[in-house]
Amino acid sequence: MFTMKKSLLVLFFLGTISLSLCQEERNADEEDGGEATEEEVKRSFLTTFKDLAIKAAKSAGQSVLSTLSCKLSNTC
């Protein structure tokens, strides 16, 4: 019973230390990443532009397909 308590204490201690180290690293990352760099701004702009272009292409493709299906089935 004593050895089981001892091993549980060791596991708890090691878990607490690793959790503490992760918290310190997270705090350091938050302090460093306060301002967006120029590359991050460009990347976010390009991602937004790409998403808008994809949505426009899907919309155009759907309208072309609906027009073609209408003309092929002579229901226009």
Swiss-Prot record:
Residues 1-22 form the signal peptide. The keyword Lipoprotein does not apply. The lineage of its organism: Eukaryota, Metazoa, Chordata, Craniata, Vertebrata. Has antimicrobial activity against Gram-negative bacterium E.coli ATCC 8739 (MIC=12.5 ug), against Gram positive bacteria S.aureus ATCC 6538 (MIC=6.3 ug) and B.subtilis ATCC 6633 (MIC=25 ug). Has no activity against methicillin-resistant S.aureus ATCC 43300 (MIC= ug) and fungus C.albicans ATCC 90028. It is found in: Secreted. Residues 23-41 form a propeptide. Disulfide bonds join 70-76. This is Brevinin-2ISb. Belongs to the frog skin active peptide (FSAP) family. Brevinin subfamily. The keyword Magnesium does not apply. Keywords: Amphibian defense peptide, Antibiotic, Antimicrobial, Cleavage on pair of basic residues, Disulfide bond, Secreted, Signal. Expressed by the skin glands. It comes from the Eukaryota. One of its GO terms (biological process) is defense response to Gram-negative bacterium. Its main location: secreted. InterPro entries: Antimicrobial_frog_2, Frog_antimicrobial_propeptide.
